[in-house]
Structures are given as C-alpha cells and as structure tokens.
Amino acid sequence: MGVGIPAEFEDRFWSRHSNPRSGWTRVPSGAIIVYAVYRRNWRVLGAALVWTAINPFLFPPPETEDAWMTRAVLAERWWVREETNRTVGLGYPNICNTVGALGFVYALYAAWRQSPKKATLGVVASVGLKLWWLRVLVTHYDRRTG
C-alpha cells in the first residue's frame, strides 16, 4: 500500500479487499462520485468517498481464491509488491490504468461542467480500462500461481 503502513494493517486490507463482494461493490463507486458531482449532491459524494475508503474492511477474507475478482485483487497486490511494479505508467499494461485514471479526471471535469454525455464517456473509459488492466494482471498472476 505504501511506505510506513504497518504490515499487519496492509495484510488485513488486502485479505479483506480480496473478497469478491468488496471488489465488485467498489466498481460503481467512481460512477456514483461523478453523478454526485454532476448533481452537486455533496451528501452522496461524501457517502461514496466514505464507502470507497471503508469498503475493503467491511467484508471477511474470501474462503477460496476461485472468484475472478479475488484473483484480480491478489494479482494487483502481487504486481505491486512482488513484481515491484507500479499501478500507473506508460508501459503495458499500466498505460491502461493511467489512461483510465485520466478518464476519471475527465469524467469529474465533465460532470462539474454539466456535460452528462462526456461524463458518462469518462466513467465508461475509466472502468473499462481498469478492468482491462486487472484482466492482464490476472492472466500473469494465474500463470505464476497455476
């Protein structure tokens, strides 16, 4: 997660976040945040931000690693920790995550400017590219562990 984070906290975060319910219920968070900005609904925005922050701690660790989203979260941790990669960059597959993050910033800007089509395009690009990035990581992770 980052420098200075106690290992026990980091392990707890990743083990709980790897529950597929944690991963899949976070996927729409970006869209809800963009919607809240578009509607200028600060309560919804606050709730979505709190949800995004606490979500990984709300679910127990998964019983198995069979679910795709479980492997996606484990692959992300493996990619960053064991392979010493970053989550963004210009090389493949990190470019997917980088452009996806820029798509999310674009979506927020479009929402603020009250442009729903552009905001939707940004959200779809952001989520699609994040899932693409995860798909690539899962493929590498499955080869390594399989």
Language-model region placement:
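Short amphipathic, positively biased membrane-proximal segments
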Residues: 1-146
